[in-house]
Amino acid sequence: MITSNFKTQENVSQAITLASWLAGEYSSIKYTLEDARTNPHIRIFFRPLPYDFFGGIGFYSEEIYDHDPWHPHYQFVKRVIPQGDSVRVENYALKDPDLHTGAGQDLEILATLTPDNIELRKGCAMIFKRQGDTFVGGVEPGHKCLIPRGDGSMTYLVSEVKVTQKTWTSRDTGYDVNTHEKIWGSNSGPFKFDKVQDFSGEIPDIAIL
């Protein structure tokens, strides 16, 4: 029992560590200046949500092109959950994303977001495991995180992510659900981002249970 309790505390600690590293604004400007053709200036926000939103730790996540901040590339809500020897990060879609655009930068907009505004993206949770000073994550097994294409075809998402205290690195790739052929995604390697603002002080000061 003592071992079990200790393991539970360790799992919670890992989840809180991942959350504190995630919390922030990230920018690709360093890599844009090196090669703007393959690295447009992108900013990503992981803004902590109040404890009452999930009864634990959650984030509003928004990715924008720097030149067009009011038309995000994506908007999601994420929930951080200890899971065995890993950390599960559930993904939720916004029912009306336009209502919450800018919430990564504006706390008044963030305050308009409620659990009624979101719905779970089934099969799209990310599973993170710590490897030294890095958390390495990927989409949960099963190829069930489906992304429809404009031509009516369906793809599944494979996402590769690395998180440190100061960086976010990611590559998303879409594969045909029938042939498993690569349909979309970067051909020039993962996108790299540096943390330029730290929001970890906004994470609720209550342990995940």
Curated annotation (Swiss-Prot):
GO MF entries: lyase activity
Disulfide pattern: none
Keyword Lyase: yes
EC annotation from Swiss-Prot or TrEMBL: 4.-.-.-
A Pfam family assignment: CpeT
Tree of life domain: Bacteria
Alphabetic keyword roster: Lyase
Record-linked InterPro entries: CpcT/CpeT (IPR010404), CpcT/CpeT_sf (IPR038672)
Keyword Lyase attributed: yes
Function noted in UniProt: Covalently attaches a chromophore to Cys residue(s) of phycobiliproteins.
Family: Belongs to the CpcT/CpeT biliprotein lyase family.
Protein name: Chromophore lyase CpcT/CpeT 1
Origin organism lineage: Bacteria, Bacillati, Cyanobacteriota, Cyanophyceae, Oscillatoriophycideae
